[in-house]
Amino acid sequence: MCIRDRYLADGEKDDSCWALQREQQYIASMMIQNTGMISLADCGEYDNIHPLDKKTPGEHLFQLAKNLVYDRQGTITATAAQLFSDNGKLYVTFDHLHEKLVMQTADSRPFEISGEDNIFYPAKADVIHGNMLCISNSAVKFPSAVKYAWYNFGEAVLFTESGNPVSPFFKSV
């Protein structure tokens, strides 16, 4: 629960007020013409939404501005678009993806999956065909929802080929 100032947190893994705030910012960026949003999942502090590292956000914002002004097609922030379930696995496709997805480590801790009971379990995630995720956990026979990096602060493992982090997401079938 977000009791403290919105930009501060206790570093609790299950605390997701920043994730909700990022989601609302993304929705606004899709509704307002000539705006965009970058993901800062690759930098930040566990207890403060404003990263001390200003260079990384500046570089991401520069790429976004270039794409908006010069109508370039590079991927700045890939966002989860569609989710479908097949044979006990969830598949996620992405919007704004003009290059391949890359898992920077084999660690898939930022991924969680649930069934209809809404109990989330750590999940295995694999990039397939360079543009889709396959997410599963053998304990979840009929998956219906997935989270990626859905917390205030934590490790980001999913990037585009050019090194831009994929936006955290929470999707249901």
Please state what every model-predicted region is.
Residues 1-3:
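Short, small-residue-biased leader/transition segments that mark boundaries at the very start
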Residues 7-41, 54:
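Substrate-gating cap/lid alpha-helix
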Residues 25, 61, 146:
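Hydrophobic, well-ordered secondary-structure elements that form the walls
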Residues 31-34, 43, 63, 67-71, ...:
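Short, well-ordered loop/turn and helix-capping segments at boundaries between secondary-structure elements
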Residues 41-50:
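Short beta-alpha connecting loops at secondary-structure transitions
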Residues 50-59:
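Short, surface-exposed amphipathic charged segments that create phosphate/polyanion-binding patches used
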Residues 56, 63-106:
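Surface beta-strand/loop "capping" patches
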Residues 98-173:
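C-terminal beta-sandwich/jelly-roll accessory domains of carbohydrate-active enzymes
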